[in-house]
Amino acid sequence: MLFGIKLANDVYPPWKDSYIDYERLKKLLKESVIHDGRSSVDSWSERNESDFVEALDKELEKVYTFQISKYNAVLRKLDDLEENTKSAEKIQKINSEQFKNTLEECLDEAQRLDNFDRLNFTGFIKIVKKHDKLHPNYPSVKSLLQVRLKELPFNNSEEYSPLLYRISYLYEFLRSNYDHPNTVSKSLASTSKLSHFSNLEDASFKSYKFWVHDDNIMEVKARILRHLPALVYASVPNENDDFVDNLESDVRVQPEARLNIGSKSNSLSSDGNSNQDVEIGKSKSVIFPQSYDPTITTLYFDNDFFDLYNNRLLKISGAPTLRLRWIGKLLDKPDIFLEKRTFTENTETGNSSFEEIRLQMKAKFINNFIFKNDPSYKNYLINQLRERGTQKEELEKLSRDFDNIQNFIVEEKLQPVLRATYNRTAFQIPGDQSIRVTIDSNIMYIREDSLDKNRPIRNPENWHRDDIDSNIPNPLRFLRAGEYSKFPYSVMEIKVINQDNSQMPNYEWIKDLTNSHLVNEVPKFSLYLQGVASLFGEDDKYVNILPFWLPDLETDIRKNPQEAYEEEKKTLQKQKSIHDKLDNMRRLSKISVPDGKTTERQGQKDQNTRHVIADLEDHESSDEEGTALPKKSAVKKGKKFKTNAAFLKILAGKNISENGNDPYSDDTDSASSFQLPPGVKKPVHLLKNAGPVKVEAKVWLANERTFNRWLSVTTLLSVLTFSIYNSVQKAEFPQLADLLAYVYFFLTLFCGVWAYRTYLKRLTLIKGRSGKHLDAPVGPILVAVVLIVTLVVNFSVAFKEAARRERGLVNVSSQPSLPRTLKPIQDFIFNLVGE
């Protein structure tokens, strides 16, 4: 399609006069005169050149001014919305419907602005190329356009990421504070409550991958933002960007943020970026805050025969991959991770799982580790961890991981062969790992191999290319043809945790997105496989097998919305007819089979399903559960399942038992009296225990502070014990002193044991989110009683002896006399304790 026709079709009517006047600029080029066969020199003069440049500059000013005004208008709306969320009083006055409508308008405007920028930017590039092609005798206008684009930072951001993050924050506010029916689907809203996986590695998952054209990327992000918040990298991540929850759903807009020139400007700019403030009126206003999407670099390993590539492409179960990965520039000394991943796929269910070995490396040790099988870094790291008090089991596991990867590199003769760089945007509900959407854009593949011994691309003695990672502006401009490949689309991946053998969860918005014209599904797509195929696929010496999706890259994946809608309708009708046939077959099978056999088969099926779910949810065996299974199966064989009133009450949220018993209680009698239907299982986790454990720091500190206080009491009692015991010979009552020393000694032991036991008990209750009381009064009461009794005994014995001496029962001539004022008090105490 000609660009002029595309521009006319994609123009947003209310903004029609603000687009580039492409047809007028074409007329100024006198294209028709050139096509008539006249000489370019005769028909094109300096005056024509000046008129064209002046018109081009005016069009730039017009488009840029309009774009700035609209962008700032959206910013003002977002500022007003954010202002209404800053205090509790303002939040109470918010009209949720009006708030949501304004937010929808901002998202819609941002989406239209992105399309506006793309169309106009493409128009300016094409008209400049047309000028240089038609009038080669005149200086190229490309350099002029480059200068003007730096002065007028038009379309400098490849994506409106800062706007999207602010909108995402406001959508999250709306979801959290208002039960709006259109804000998020009910199924998605309940996901965070039902998800109880504390670690993604504990469950299998399904992965769905799609290609997204650059023209549709903004609309795709806008659709996702209505249901999932964007995950903002508050800092440079240093762990697994796929599974570690190292992200914050927060927007940190810096008022003095600078401008970031996007990748489209790189075709015109040698340095690839520019920083500039833009003055509007009398005050400076930030046009594009910096993007939060991190640049991830991955260095893949393989051997001369590309065995890892072939094994992965042929879907050999357990085929491993090895990669080095870091975020940002290597000169900034980021955390570098060496990762060995082994994916396994269940061919029956389609579920995927993986095992991963991850080592954090230092750049200066990588060469010796990879090429010389040097264990010095392993020994250095283990010694450091041992000095810090790391447990022996962890050190042994770390040593095994080092040996595993080193042996893998040596046995397979691996070396770095391919570099992939991309920007990642992630969408996920914080704390809920059941569904996650990532979009990787600006994907670039670069050869990093030394397969050709005569002309190696990478120094064979170094693990990475020094020319790319050097401290020079835009080092990619030095790449030669054939050394790099730009992937034309963005890659969207939807990862869904499988709690059973079901297919993709019934999220309507996901179905609408994945079946729309905006995305093109590519099952089993892999960044590594695509990179090897694009850079090494033409050389039969290296690669003889290619991925099935390569031919699709030669076609335009964009679809007509109407055609995509009709195709989706046909697909849904076909699926519905298949489901109807299957349901009919199930009904017929139930009628034809006797009741007893049907019940027995259904019971076996339910038990198998329950075993599968137990494998996903509980990784610890239980003897009690093992002995109870035969009893449950016997009950199933003796009864035929009926959908009774109690089950309907459960679904309705009413009284869940007709006899007053709770079928979900721990009582085995009441639980066995109620039989759940197929596919419904007894909950094993409370909703309050779903998700990761998040307890305020003051709770942990209070428990530790109490333990420390008990330790101080234990220390004081031990000092008292040994002081008394060491001074027994000097005491006036040696037997009493000896007895008290032993009493205090046992009291000291009790305090230490009691303190540690209480600390562990409270720690368990805190981690388990238990509602039980944390008080433990027995210990303090017992210590207080023992101390009081010993003091009273010591006091009584001492004063009895003093009374005897005072009354002449013992020779007291050597005792000093008391003042006359204290004599009545002494007599009272003597009478109280007796003689």
Curated annotation (Swiss-Prot):
InterPro entries: DUF202, SPX_dom, VTC_Complex_Subunit, VTC_domain, VTC_sf. One of its GO terms (cellular component) is endoplasmic reticulum. The chain crosses the membrane at residues 710-727, 736-756, 779-799. Residues 617-626 have a biased composition (Acidic residues). GO terms for biological process: engulfment of target by autophagosome; intracellular phosphate ion homeostasis; microautophagy; polyphosphate biosynthetic process; polyphosphate metabolic process; vacuolar transport; vacuole fusion, non-autophagic. The record marks Y22, K26 as: Important for inositol polyphosphate binding. Residues 1-709, 757-778 are cytoplasmic. It comes from the Eukaryota. Residues 564-586, 597-610 have a biased composition (Basic and acidic residues). The modification Phosphoserine is found at S43, S45, S50, S195, S198, S270, S274, S589, S592, S621, S622. Residues 728-735, 800-835 are vacuolar. It is found in: Vacuole membrane; Cytoplasm, Cell cortex; Endoplasmic reticulum membrane; Cytoplasmic vesicle, Autophagosome membrane. Residues 1-145 form the SPX domain. Residues 126-133 are annotated as: Important for inositol polyphosphate binding. Accessory subunit of the vacuolar transporter chaperone (VTC) complex. The VTC complex acts as a vacuolar polyphosphate polymerase that catalyzes the synthesis of inorganic polyphosphate (polyP) via transfer of phosphate from ATP to a growing polyP chain, releasing ADP. VTC exposes its catalytic domain VTC4 to the cytosol, where the growing polyP chain winds through a tunnel-shaped pocket, integrating cytoplasmic polymer synthesis with polyP membrane translocation. Present with 2630 molecules/cell in log phase SD medium. Belongs to the VTC2/3 family. The SPX domain has very high affinity for inositol polyphosphates, such as myo-inositol hexakisphosphate and 5-diphospho-myo-inositol pentakisphosphate (5-InsP7), and moderate affinity for inorganic pyrophosphate. Its affinity for inorganic phosphate is 2 to 3 orders of magnitude lower. SPX domains may integrate inositol pyrophosphates (PP-InsP)-dependent signaling to adapt cytosolic phosphate concentrations to different metabolic situations. This is Vacuolar transporter chaperone 3 complex subunit 3.
